[in-house]
């Protein structure tokens, strides 16, 4: 499945608009528990489906609450995307938790511990 230039442009525009909608228009208190960032959008080749990857800063409870809030707001966000972007078909949106930032942070902490000598051979 090759990613076309058109799909890349649409995905980038969707990413920007979804971030704006979540930040400015979704009034769900569950989204205020953790800082929500849209990290990427992956479109199917026919542009009928979109996976929206989000990173949520906060503890496990804040992440769960924010994901519930996003699930509840999905139809509103999809409707807004349909009005803002001139697409033939507004994709069905699925939110996915992106843990790559936390994973990278964990690796950085491990590397810092190795540099500090915590894992030196005895």
Curated annotation (Swiss-Prot):
Taxonomic superkingdom: Bacteria
Q: Which GO terms describe its cellular component?
A: cytosol
A Pfam family (short name) is: RBFA
Q: Which residues form a coiled coil?
A: none
GO terms assigned for molecular function: ribosomal small subunit binding
Keyword terms, alphabetized: Cytoplasm, Ribosome biogenesis
Query: What is the annotated localization of this protein?
Result: Cytoplasm
Q: Name one GO biological process term.
A: maturation of SSU-rRNA
Write out the similarity annotation: Belongs to the RbfA family.
Cite the PANTHER family for this sequence: RIBOSOME-BINDING FACTOR A, CHLOROPLASTIC-RELATED (PTHR33515:SF1)
Q: How does it assemble?
A: Monomer. Binds 30S ribosomal subunits, but not 50S ribosomal subunits or 70S ribosomes.
- This one is known as Ribosome-binding factor A
Gene name of this polypeptide: rbfA
